[in-house]
Design a protein with these regions (language model features):
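NAD(P)H-binding glycine-rich loop region in Rossmannoid oxidoreductase-like domains
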Residues: 48-88, 96-99, 113-116
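Short alpha-helix in the Rossmann-fold core of NAD(P)-dependent oxidoreductases
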Residues: 83-90, 107, 126, 181
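Conserved catalytic-site region of short-chain dehydrogenase/reductase
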Residues: 76, 112-124, 150-154
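Substrate-positioning beta->alpha
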Residues: 92, 156-160, 174-196, 203-207
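N-terminal Rossmann NAD(P)H-binding glycine-rich loop of SDR-like oxidoreductase domains
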Residues: 5-25
């Protein structure tokens, strides 16, 4: 029986950890890449193409018993940018997997943001993708991961925040009582491999974090103060200033021919009051538990 896992998003910072985790467990991996790669190995084959390329997707999922869909659009200046990749691209991949005839399990890496689709274009696109994938997954076990904020080696989004924390400055982007949560990319990758390896994977949605249900800004302040052995100043950033920053980011990104990360739509996610996580079903269903707490990561600079 095939031991092949087809992976999208393998060139991204999370995807690189997923590839490493799967390879360490002895799986043969076939991964999608937009740019040509010359680093294939006996157990890792790169397929050049994109989620818009049906021929590449057919080659990607050929003989693959498992599909891990980690590719996604996280930057964008309008709703359509997210819909085309996160919704339509996901549906094309599942359709290719069904037509290939070998796929038994399909894992969609969504986002905790999908819990509140009304917040942003990104959140809504992930939620819609979840619903549409579920509707067309007959005959294939569909798993959905909703990881919270992911950080780790290669991350460019949370690293600046952690760097400033260790310099003694912590920008507070929402109210003091906001519930935050985090997960290290290594733990997320191990959760992926554990789900794939499970004897009886459940068709279920899983929220994932580092084991701490929620942090508040004062908790981050205390973690950073302990790590740097010095004071950390917590500086609230007013909403109007975040909006100005988002407008500037959007304008300059588009002028540079790039999609912006910080937009007014994204601000609604950043300032949402509750990103707490309950992950007991992941522990119960496929015996996964995280190994890297935020405290450990900050103290040992694992980002």
């Amino acid at each position: 029986m095939s031991n092949t896992v087809a992976v999208t998003g393998g060139t991204g910072f999370i995807g690189k950890h997923i590839l490493a985790s799967l390879l360490s467990r002895g799986y043969t991996v076939r991964a999608l890449t937009r740019a040509p790669r010359n680093d294939s190995t006996p157990h890792l084959t790169w397929i050049q193409g994109s989620l818009e390329d049906k021929n590449a997707l057919a080659e990607l999922v050929k003989d693959a018993r498992y599909v891990v869909h980690g590719a996604g659009q996280v930057r964008g200046h309008n709703e359509d940018v997210f819909t085309q990749c996160n919704v339509m691209g996901s549906l094309r991949l599942l359709q290719a997997a069904k037509e290939g005839g070998y796929c038994e399990r399909f894992l969609f890496i969504s986002s905790l943001a999908a819990r509140h689709p009304e917040l942003s274009w990104y959140a809504n696109s992930k939620y819609i993708a979840e619903q549409k994938l579920a509707a067309m997954s007959s005959g294939i076990t569909l798993g959905v991961f909703r990881p919270t904020a992911v950080y780790g080696s290669g991350d460019k989004e949370l690293k600046p925040l952690f760097d400033w924390m260790l310099r003694g400055i912590l920008p507070q982007l929402s109210t003091a009582e906001t519930k935050l949560s985090f997960i290290h990319a290594i733990d997320l990758a191990q959760a992926v491999a554990q789900w794939v390896s499970s004897d009886v994977p459940q068709a279920q949605t899983y929220e994932l974090c580092d084991g701490t249900e929620s942090y508040r800004w004062k908790d981050l302040q205390a973690i950073a103060a302990s790590a740097r052995q010095g004071p950390v100043r917590l500086i609230p950033i007013p909403l109007y200033l975040l909006k100005i920053m988002a407008d500037i980011s959007t304008r300059f990104s588009l002028l540079a021919g790039k999609e912006p990360m910080l937009t007014r739509s994204k601000i609604c996610e950043l300032t949402h009051p509750d990103w707490s996580v309950s992950m007991q079903n992941a522990v119960d269903d496929f015996n996964w538990s995280p190994g890297i707490s935020l405290t450990h990561a900050i103290h040992h600079r694992l980002f």
